[in-house]
Design a protein with these regions (language model features):
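Pyridoxal 5′-phosphate
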Residues: 1-397
Length: 397
């Protein structure tokens, strides 16, 4: 039996998701833009999924029901790109300053880099040793020329929950976008001040290749993909009906009983962390110790997602530990899957002040509602063996 602890990279689809997708592929395959009954049937499926995902956003505390419009696209990366580049270009006549943090997902940072090449002024907000943004710096950077602020809700490498509600309250006349890919259906906390919210299906046990961008009513952005004007003209191209249907089912199921499910995940995460601390010496915990479902919170504020735990095993290489665990049927990550195949250290851990050696030994364990205490015993046992073996070999060099 495998132990899958790479749920921040992707998740296993719910069986109900696969079932509805198969039905759409076999029976409900009409083009939703067609004027016949098969087209209407597909359009109805999209409408229902939009309602399901919108309701899940509301349950997650990310937006209030009825405040905006949600349109489907290919995933979190496209959502981030569209929000950032679309908003910046639509509001350029009001200013040219854009603000984000050093710890964002590459989909955000690369969008900002492209806009900088096009003449926009970019400000990067620093983070502390817990990966939390410097609020004082953010406040000082916002001025009358600021047209967009983009800050993620939950960091995908450390699980740190950013104070986005507090940050959004400082926005003045700027638009505020949050990448909520790792928060959706996992961390219930209000970001009602956000103007745009990016989410993804495959992080919540839905299909890959589909995501959504929620936009508050009255906000106009320039679409990146032009054509037939689908998705209320925000995202042209024939909709991926099976994936959208699967996304709707996944959002409905993942958001149902979310608090109780995530409390269980938090308990498993805590058990794993305590086991590692007890059995393995010379580690650095890169995630805040306590999740948003535990009592020990800083000033009453949640610190970390219950799903993510990032630890550096000093004197080792994360990639070697990863493959050692893989041989035992345990699957973890050394960082974000979007960039973990590159031979560069994590930009997030570097911004937190970790040395190259500390970053090199980092492992990310990301849990889901299906992980168990018994699995964590197996993980700790095999992890200790792998770390001890590597350190012993290293000392013989």
């Amino acid at each position: 039996m495998i132990v899958y602890l790479d749920n921040s990279s992707t998740t296993k689809q719910y069986d109900e998701v696969t079932k509805i997708m198969l039905k759409c592929m076999q029976d409900e395959y009409g083009n939703p833009s067609s004027l016949h009954s098969m087209g209407f049937a597909s359009e109805k499926i999209i409408k229902k999924s939009r309602e399901q995902v919108s309701e899940a956003l509301s349950r997650s505390g990310l937006c209030a029901s009825g405040e905006g419009y949600l349109f489907f696209n290919s995933g979190g990366t496209e959502s981030d790109n569209t929000a950032i580049m679309g908003a910046a270009k639509a509001r350029r006549r009001y200013g040219n300053k854009l603000i984000t943090s050093e710890a964002e997902h590459p989909a955000v940072l690369e969008s900002f880099k492209r806009l900088e090449e096009e003449g926009f002024e970019i400000s990067l907000i620093g983070i502390d040793e817990n990966c939390r943004i410097d609020m004082d710096q953010l406040k000082s950077e916002i001025n009358e020329k600021t047209i967009l602020i983009s800050l993620m809700k939950v960091n995908n490498e450390t699980g740190t929950i950013q104070p986005v509600l507090e940050a959004a309250e400082q926005k003045k006349n700027a638009l505020f976008h949050t990448d909520a890919v790792q928060a959706f259906c996992r961390v219930p906390q209000s970001v009602h001040k956000a103007d745009m919210i990016s989410i993804s299906s495959h992080k919540i046990h839905g299909p890959k290749g589909v995501g959504a961008l929620w936009i508050k009513k009255g906000i106009n952005i320039k679409p990146l993909i032009l054509g037939g004007g689908q998705e209320n003209k925000f995202r042209s191209g024939t909709e991926n009906v099976p994936a959208i249907a699967g996304f709707g089912i996944a959002a409905e199921k993942a958001s149902g009983g979310m608090a109780e499910k995530m409390k269980r995940v938090a308990g498993v995460r805590k058990y794993l962390l305590e086991g590692i601390k007890k059995e393995i010496e010379d580690i650095r915990v890169n995630s805040p110790d306590y999740s948003c479902y535990e009592k020990n919170q800083e000033n009453g504020m949640p610190l970390c997602s219950p799903s993510i735990l990032n630890i550096s095993f000093l004197g080792t290489r994360g990639e070697v530990i990863l493959h050692s665990l893989e041989q035992e049927g345990i699957f973890v990550s050394t960082g974000a899957a979007c960039s973990s195949n590159k031979k560069t250290k994590s930009h997030v851990l570097a911004a937190m002040g970790l040395s190259e050696k500390e970053s090199e030994g980092a492992i990310r364990f990301s849990l889901s509602e299906g992980n168990t205490i018994e699995e964590m015993d197996r993980v700790v046992y095999n992890l200790k063996k792998a770390v001890d073996r590597f350190r012993k070999l290293g000392s013989l060099r």
